[in-house]
Amino acid sequence: MGFVEKMFEQTVKDVCGQTKIEYGGNKIEFKGPYKRLAFFDAIKEKTGDDISKMNEDELVKYCKSKNIETNKSMGRGKLFDAVFGEFCEKELIQPTYITDYPIEMSPLTKKHRSKEGLTERFELFINGKEIANAYSEQNNPIEQRKSFEDQMRLAEKGDDEAMFIDENFCTALEYGLPPTGGWGFGIDRFTMFLTDNNNIKEVLLFPAMKPEAVSYTHLRAHETREDRV
């Protein structure tokens, strides 16, 4: 997290001449250190409720009481995420680390070494958007297979985003993976901040564009006599 802070702070300073910028009507300070907040603490801070021990049925009832839309395919992970998205995400304007995500939201992540039910993962949010995601990789093949099996059960319920059991990956882990971690960040979203752009297509080198609509009259004008016979 310290590395990420230093990189973001220095990049903003080099590009903009200072560490504070204005984007979307918000003044954002990139100078570290950034606020750190555990996932369930962030939810409790906004709602006053501790939902960390709720089972699936209790979470569904809780979501309904808060007018959060749910469906039968949602497991604990997606229900937790729905609550966080409703009450917390859009409120994280200043750079903020959300840490200690629940296991159900992080199927490839190593379990937290001292906090039961949580993982060694953080995400960085700025201006209500996720900008970076990082975690310790799960390198225990037995635990990883269990996570994949949990994902398969969600897929059977209708979750089209659930993972499948990756046999090749599990086999590779059985040969051994040293302690590993990594992070990635949305460079396009970050560039939007630096250039004060609210359209991501404006900062993509090769944005995906829909083909220009061609009218029926235009097509008829270019048909040959043989085409019309």
Enumerate the language-model features and the residues they cover.
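Short amphipathic C-terminal alpha-helix that caps PH/PH-like domains
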Residues: 1-11
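Short, well-ordered loop/turn and helix-capping segments at boundaries between secondary-structure elements
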Residues: 10-13, 48, 127, 137, ...
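Metal-assisted phosphate- and nucleotidyl-transfer catalytic regions
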Residues: 13-129, 147-177, 215
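Flexible loop/turn segments at secondary-structure boundaries
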Residues: 104-108, 132-133, 139-142, 191-192, ...
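Conserved phosphate/anionic-ligand binding catalytic regions in large, soluble enzymes, centered on
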Residues: 130-133, 137, 178-193
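Acidic, carboxylate-rich catalytic segments that either coordinate divalent cations
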Residues: 174, 191, 197-213
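Conserved small/polar residues in nucleotide/adenosyl-binding loops
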Residues: 217-224
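Hydrophobic alpha-helical segments, chiefly the membrane-spanning helices
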Residues: 228-229
